[in-house]
């Protein structure tokens, strides 16, 4: 049962890191990069 929890945490951490890198550098919208708030 503990292995399942550790696996879930590992997948969750990898998912968070993946999304963080993906949203950090958007593949499109070069114009939005110019108009920064």
Swiss-Prot record:
It is found in: Plastid, Chloroplast thylakoid membrane. GO terms for biological process: photosynthesis. Keywords: Chloroplast, Membrane, Photosynthesis, Photosystem II, Plastid, Thylakoid, Transmembrane, Transmembrane helix. Its main location: plastid. It comes from the Eukaryota. The chain crosses the membrane at residues 3-23. SUPFAM superfamilies: Photosystem II reaction center protein T, PsbT (SSF161029). It is a single-pass membrane protein. PSII is composed of 1 copy each of membrane proteins PsbA, PsbB, PsbC, PsbD, PsbE, PsbF, PsbH, PsbI, PsbJ, PsbK, PsbL, PsbM, PsbT, PsbY, PsbZ, Psb30/Ycf12, at least 3 peripheral proteins of the oxygen-evolving complex and a large number of cofactors. It forms dimeric complexes. Belongs to the PsbT family. PANTHER family: PHOTOSYSTEM II REACTION CENTER PROTEIN T, PTHR36411. Found at the monomer-monomer interface of the photosystem II (PS II) dimer, plays a role in assembly and dimerization of PSII. PSII is a light-driven water plastoquinone oxidoreductase, using light energy to abstract electrons from H(2)O, generating a proton gradient subsequently used for ATP formation. This is Photosystem II reaction center protein T.
């Amino acid at each position: 049962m503990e292995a399942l929890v550790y696996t879930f945490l590992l997948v969750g951490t990898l998912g968070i890191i993946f999304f963080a890198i993906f949203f950090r550098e958007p593949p499109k919208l070069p114009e939005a990069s110019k108009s920064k708030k």
